[in-house]
């Protein structure tokens, strides 16, 4: 990635974003916005939905499991934040408010394959557009490793516009840690959309702060 991105320029933009804005009474997140160009989102292969594990996550994500039977026990032992049983899933049917609340309450969800048809019917219409559909855990998967990975990951999506928006840190983290988080995301994007051809610009901002712009000409190594 160092051959594509000028890390010194990007680090200076991160530091500027951290300085910008008034102090708040809460710990602000640091957000990354990547604007791409010449990406045809009418082509299904360009509409991506990726999980990227951060080297320095700002805080552990909350992970819930839709579970029953042996999978419920495995999920509990893996340290999920909540278990949602089959009966609870069925009780959600038609209750859009409760489903929306659940989608906001947790960052990621997991489920065994046999629950996916039920989940698709009950929560799919609300979870799907939000990118919150559960990660399917096959019978041979290491549930604990999956949960630990999700607790450190962010979702990178391209759906209706060629823009990626993702939380990459908090204002209390070192700029160098935030830089490393951003670089792994840019690496994933570069594999699919070579940034020398497709990057329009990068914006970095705190939750309530003004964005700092890094234009492609500034941040790309030519």
From Swiss-Prot:
GO biological-process terms attached to the record: regulation of translation; translation
Signal peptide: none
Keywords per UniProt: Repressor, Ribonucleoprotein, Ribosomal protein, RNA-binding, rRNA-binding, Translation regulation, tRNA-binding
PROSITE patterns noted in UniProt: RIBOSOMAL_L1 (PS01199)
Protein task: Binds directly to 23S rRNA. Probably involved in E site tRNA release.
NCBIfam families according to UniProt: PRK04203.1
Name assigned to this protein: Large ribosomal subunit protein uL1
